[in-house]
Swiss-Prot record:
May be involved in RNA biogenesis. Belongs to the GARIN family. The lineage of its organism: Eukaryota, Metazoa, Chordata, Craniata, Vertebrata. Keywords: Golgi apparatus, Nucleus, Phosphoprotein. GO terms for cellular component: Cajal body; Golgi apparatus; sperm head. Residues 205-214, 478-491, 528-556 have a biased composition (Basic and acidic residues). This is Golgi-associated RAB2B interactor protein 3. It comes from Rattus norvegicus.
Amino acid sequence: MSSECLLPYYTAHSYRSMGVFNTSMGNLQRQLYKGGEYDIFKYAPMFESDFIQISKKGEVIDVHNRVRMVTVCIASTSPVLPLPDVMLLARPAKVCEEHARRARFIKGRGYKPSKTLELTRLLPLKFVKISIHDHEKQQLRLKLATGRTFYLQLCPSSDAREDLFCYWEKLVYLLRPPVNSCISNPSIPTADTSTETKSTLVSEIHGEGDRDSKFQTSQDVSEATSAAFAGGERTQPNIAAILTTGLAKARAAGAAAGTGAAGTAGTAGAAGATGAAGATGAAGSARAAGGAGSARAAGATGSARAAGATGSARAAGATGSARAAGGNTAAAVMTPLAGLARAGTPTSPVSGVISIAATTSKSPGSGQVATGLTGTASKDQERSESSKAMAVVANITTESVDVVLAGAASFTSESPSAEGDAYGSPDTGLNVAFAGSITTKGPAEDKPEAPLVSTLQSEGYMCERDGSQKVSHTSSETQKEKRERRESDRKGSRKSSHHQRTGASRHSSSKDKGRKTSSYRSVSGHGKTREDKKEKGRGSLRDQRHSSSYRSESRTGHKSRKNRPAASGGFVSKRATKIRSFFRAFLVRPTLKTENTSGERGGVDIVTKLVEKQDIETTVEKSKDLEFSDTMASESMEKIILETKPI
């Protein structure tokens, strides 16, 4: 026996499938051995046969009325490998066919020329699924990772073995063992069957019609091809990485959704007109870790407090953060105009978590509304589990009612697994917790509001109790003297009404001139001619003081100033305007101090004439926006500080 015939026995002597590969050398193997074009296959164990291409129904596919012959060869790139890893496809060369026709025409029909094959395909077996299509007709089915399927029928030569197809059946079960043998004891795989189990999983992954994974297999094909051309020195690539090729999906390592509702409490107490209500809201968090991504949301805390007859609402929290890993995207939206903040993130379509947190705060009309919301939702399609959690805090404040509401709700659903009972019902759970309080505000007691300085100026009069509050530091002796004089002068006030008008007209004609010279006259004194003239003026001022005290008493008795006689309206308005401008000096500048003046003559003089008219008007203009928020106590006190001089 020649060395060529001993070659397969030599290379397959220690091979695991030596029963299949202990055959004579075929045409393709002989051509590769002699040609030396592919050194990697020169001493490689091979098992080859000739096939013709057919359709799924078993019909012969002919191209240009010719049968398509295909030589299928299963080989191993290295004798170290436990299983073959490469499939070679070859066809008769065109040049060889033309040469055979010419030789047959020259030498006759009995001449049988040597057959030359052309190597067309080199496919790693991990991307090819070989199965038995029809045992009786000796047909095989080849399904590639690209999704294409070919049907081949064995066409042995005349000198081939009769049980050649049985060897192909053994080889198919060697490359792809039955599913029962893999599932029988999957926890303890042997060294020989571990690769077979992996090959089975690979073949199951690349099912019929899986055309979406074409672009993913190119890298693995190049890697396997380079490993094959390396002479078998490199080991077989990791099958764990192969299992992921052909599937365009990511599996999450775990998804856990936890919901918590803590601190839903409401307290309401009434002490007088005071009520307090508190509610602290709920938090939900969900986390998912793995290749799909992760999302976290925590927050949504709201609090509301109400004290006394007035209510104040506060809402804090509603912060959301979303984090994504593994190519996922996160989005956050802020709308400051509407007072709404939202944040959320999506994850993978297989199993993921979606979380959102939002808060709103607005004041429609006289009321206030503050709400806080957070929620999470997770779903695992593989385990058929889903969970939802939501927490809400709301506070509504109006003029009469304060409403505080806080609550949390969680929903979980779990469908029965495929291994369990097929008629089982899904397990669902719902937890709801709410707490709220309502505080009703009673009508506030009517509080007297003090008039504004600007209002008093427009109305044309000055309230006595305001002036009494500003100049309330007068001595008790002065008050007693004023009361005695008021009682004594009240009787003669009516008789001297005509004299009062005359003195008032005289005093109004002098205007600022008499006001400026009065202070100078009271301090230093001038000639007797001026003193005689002003003596009458002092008498008129004394009568003016009596009439003003009478008018103040009438106003204290709630009599309207507009109901006075129209005949004396002109004189009274002028005199009231002067006294009003004088009193405003005490309201705006309460720190004014009255100085005691001395003179040789006796009588009553107005000491506050030291304040000029320009200063009074400027001070009043600056005090137009002044508002008295406190309650004014009504006291009957004189606004004019008088000083009695010895005669």
